[in-house]
Design a protein with these regions (language model features):
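Contiguous, amphipathic alpha-helical segments that mediate oligomerization or scaffolding
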Residues: 3-43
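Detector for the mature cores of small, proteolytically processed
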Residues: 3, 7, 52-115
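A contiguous, surface-oriented mixed alpha/beta subdomain in the mid-to-C-terminal portion of proteins
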Residues: 41-51
């Protein structure tokens, strides 16, 4: 049986891990929005879809980017005439948004909104 000191240390480590996890999720969401905001002025929210890809790996992919009034600024099905926008969406997908589904799969499968 673990001694009391070990149980206390373990409990603290669990609390620290949960706090760090929550902070990382919040920072990933902010990084995604601010990165898109650099190339899509007025970007306020992202509509994304979380699913398993053909290799069985969970992915979260941006479908649309909206402004604060709900107007579509980017739609993956339409694309964008500015290659910088397309590149930014691809970067945000792999560097920030995909990490969200790894960290909290229950929150990011199916249709989700990130703001």
């Amino acid at each position: 049986m673990p001694d009391t000191e070990l149980e206390i240390e373990y409990s603290q480590a669990v609390r620290d891990h949960r706090a760090a996890h929550s902070r990382l999720v919040m920072l990933l969401r902010r990084m995604a929005m601010e990165s898109l905001g650099d190339v899509v002025p007025g970007a306020s929210s992202i509509a994304a879809v979380g699913e398993f890809n053909e290799d069985g790996i969970p992915t979260l992919r941006i479908q649309r980017v909206f402004d604060a009034e709900g107007r579509v600024l980017f739609d993956v099905d339409v694309g964008h005439s500015d290659r910088e926008v397309e590149d930014a969406v691809d970067f945000v997908d792999t560097e920030y948004v995909d990490v969200l589904i790894d960290l909290a799969p229950g929150d990011y499968f199916g249709s989700v909104v990130i703001d």
